[in-house]
């Protein structure tokens, strides 16, 4: 339920097509399918192109935000030519090597997942069998200054800075892999490409899906951004990391209460054949547009407070263990 007094800005609502964004996302669908290209994809690939363009243009009215998304900002090198002969190493060695490289080149989190067609947007293909998922953390003091505004765009600028950093990590790693003679493609945000990053990052062990529709990591909470590298370098997949945040979200209402347009469901929804946490796009995006990226749900998440995520993970796992013990 939206907060009293909140009215969606017609600058954005007037650009909604007849189709609901929730329908495009598959809300209520019971059959498993690939995600459809949507917001942040090229505007000719979906019905929300005019709205997407207006949101971007509105955000770029902020000189500080516009500067961070300028082509002059460092986002990493262009791809090099792949070495002719691939270096032969065991998958375990390569897995360790790419993780070490990413962490030594501005990355904070890294995990590996096998490519699954369900991670790939309809109409796209990822020909490589492996996905290296990368996370970069955000500065909480900056992030916590939500919602951003033209007078104080600090939190939106922080998001843009970390997207740039995530881009540098994945592009540097791409060139490292190409130099070893293996194929590699950098997949970076904020604009969408072939990969739906959150499901892949969950599979790679970077965290769990939160009630706010974003990831929660056991160390950094929701205060991080993603990029990825797709490759045919022989690797080993990591396992998903279940540290109890899903149980926590079930009883927590911090993000859903804080959300001005009331876009966050308090219960899981059926989305493309999977029951999961979901955010109402049609309610979220007008406020996201007006609030210059918003970010309230991420900043207010109890897991995002510095030092809180490890303590909450320990608490939730201990609680789960007690329940198992009591039921034995």
Where are these regions (language model features)?
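Catalytic cores of enzyme domains
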Residues: 92, 99, 108-322
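Iron-sulfur (Fe-S) cluster-binding modules
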Residues: 1-112, 122-127, 299, 303-328
């Amino acid at each position: 339920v939206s907060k009293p007094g909140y009215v969606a800005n017609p600058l954005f609502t007037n650009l909604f097509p007849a189709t609901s964004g929730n329908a495009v996302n598959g809300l209520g669908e019971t059959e498993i399918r690939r995600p459809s290209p949507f917001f942040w994809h090229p505007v000719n690939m979906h019905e929300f192109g005019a709205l997407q363009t207006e949101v971007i243009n509105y955000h770029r009215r902020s000189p500080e935000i516009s500067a961070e998304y300028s082509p002059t900002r460092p986002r990493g090198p262009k791809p090099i030519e792949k070495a002719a002969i691939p270096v032969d190493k065991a998958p375990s060695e390569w897995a360790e090597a790419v993780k070490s490289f990413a962490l030594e080149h501005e990355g904070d989190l890294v995990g590996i997942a096998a490519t699954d067609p369900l991670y790939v947007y309809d109409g796209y293909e990822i020909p490589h069998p492996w996905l290296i998922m990368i996370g970069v953390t955000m500065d909480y003091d900056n992030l916590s200054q939500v919602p951003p505004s033209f007078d104080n765009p600090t939190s939106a600028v922080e998001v843009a800075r970390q997207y740039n950093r995530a881009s540098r990590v994945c592009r540097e790693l791409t060139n490292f892999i190409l130099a070893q003679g293996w194929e590699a493609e950098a997949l970076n945000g904020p604009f969408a490409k072939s990969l739906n990053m959150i499901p892949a990052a969950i599979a790679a062990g970077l965290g769990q899906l939160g009630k706010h529709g974003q990831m929660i990591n056991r160390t950094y909470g929701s205060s991080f951004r993603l990029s990825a590298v797709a490759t045919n370098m022989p690797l080993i997949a990591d396992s998903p990391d279940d540290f109890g945040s899903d149980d926590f979200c079930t009883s927590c209402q911090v993000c859903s209460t804080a959300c001005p347009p009331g876009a966050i469901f308090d219960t899981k929804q059926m989305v493309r054949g999977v029951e999961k946490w979901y955010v109402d796009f049609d309610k979220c995006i007008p406020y996201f547009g007006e609030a210059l990226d918003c970010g309230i749900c991420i900043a207010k998440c109890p897991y995002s407070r510095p030092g809180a995520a490890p303590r909450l993970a320990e608490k939730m796992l201990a609680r789960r263990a007690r329940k198992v013990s009591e039921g034995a």
